[in-house]
Amino acid sequence: MLLGVNIDHIAVLRQARMVNDPDLLEAAFIAAKHGDQITLHVREDRRHAQDFDLENIIKFCKSPINLECALNDEILNLALKLKPHRVTLVPEKREELTTEGGLCLNHTKLKQSIEKLQNANIEVSLFINPSLEDIEKSKNLKAQFIELHTGHYANLHNALFSNISHTAFALKELGQDKKNLQAQFEKELQNLELCAKKGTELGLKVAAGHGLNYKNVKPVVKIKEICELNIGQSIVARSVFTGLQNAILEMKELIKR
């Protein structure tokens, strides 16, 4: 299984002081050496990664670059100019802390944007909710790749197997009934497996990501139809204590098959 290392949160730390440290390009070199792909989200509001970050990483790194971006003309034109290996189209809301759900596949610009990127020899992935309907739509839109949003799975795992329910970060809508949480967790894991199988049957390459960490990744790794995981925040958080290289290598060991 391949690991895409999302280095957005290195940029978050840099932007907190509006300085050039930590150096995102240095992080990209480490991710390129020890991971399989560099994933970078250039948001409309440029809250962390900047245009020059993407340009430098594409210019100087040998690894495949997976650019996450919204259906924004300015950023799509940047992608067409710089030509990352892949563009993963994601939804985006200015007020969100992180990407909260899958892409709306009924967007009028979507098909046209996919065609433009593919005509420039850029692979296109769609970041979608794990639903059979969205997988069928992705196939009809002629995307080559899908990335299943694992956020709900990750939230359920946290609620079940950590103390988050007793902290300020608890998701109250999940409730605290362990039996109910366990049933939801098992159902969501089965759903991810079903969706991954459906995507593979339709000829799509299947990735997964969002909220995956060192404690919850193993069950997802067992879904053999998923060929790639894109993981960022948990790796960067671990790197504070172990260093980025060790954090990546530890995750690589966990996702070995």
Curated annotation (Swiss-Prot):
Coiled coil: none annotated. SUPFAM superfamilies: Pyridoxine 5'-phosphate synthase. The active site is at H41, E68, H210. It is found in: Cytoplasm. The record marks E147 as: Transition state stabilizer. It comes from the Bacteria. GO terms for biological process: pyridoxine biosynthetic process. Catalyzes the complicated ring closure reaction between the two acyclic compounds 1-deoxy-D-xylulose-5-phosphate (DXP) and 3-amino-2-oxopropyl phosphate (1-amino-acetone-3-phosphate or AAP) to form pyridoxine 5'-phosphate (PNP) and inorganic phosphate. Belongs to the PNP synthase family. Homooctamer; tetramer of dimers. This is Pyridoxine 5'-phosphate synthase. It comes from Campylobacter jejuni subsp. jejuni serotype O:6 (strain 81116 / NCTC 11828). The gene is pdxJ.
